[in-house]
């Protein structure tokens, strides 16, 4: 399979569609590092020690499974998550100075197949950058219904005064229940070693 750019910005690049179809290996010519799928690709391959492949979805390993065009999706996974706090101050690692009149927000949404993206809402939170921790105002439990958990994940975007300053991503296939650490990355996919997001995950 080859994917050619629609224009100069390669806007038709979507690795999830390849993975969902069972394509295991792809050569990627990434010309920018500030795209959601670039970070998603990096985090996904990290689970395989950067060997450069993603296993086929589980449904392709079932010989008796027949998928028709209008069948309902299989392997439904219900996930709930509550963000506890962000360890250490996020903004100080971006080199930006905070003013009291400005604010931070974090959005959380599903990055995956079209069915998963369309059936789940995007959550938005206001962040309060404290002396030690970045706290979350009006924290609430987020719930997601996932059809293709093998090739999907959660994307976190942190904005300061409406400017994107940090991102995070966690694939559903490596998500475990309990308190978990989610690494935070810059816009260029460089990991901030001294800060992270702490979340409480549960699978229903």
Task: List where the protein language model places each region.
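C2/C2-like lipid-binding beta-sandwich modules
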Residues: 59-112, 143-149, 203
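Solvent-exposed serine/threonine-rich low-complexity stretches and specific carbohydrate-binding patches
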Residues: 118-133, 170
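C2-type phospholipid-binding modules
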Residues: 37-44, 147-204
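Eukaryotic intrinsically disordered and solvent-exposed regulatory patches
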Residues: 8-14, 63-70, 89-95, 125-129, ...
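Long, highly charged low-complexity segments enriched in Glu/Asp and Lys/Arg with interspersed Ser/Thr
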Residues: 39, 46-65
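Exposed aromatic-hydrophobic patches
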Residues: 133-147, 169-170
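Catalytic and substrate-binding clefts that recognize carbohydrates or anionic sugar/phosphate headgroups
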Residues: 1-40, 45-48
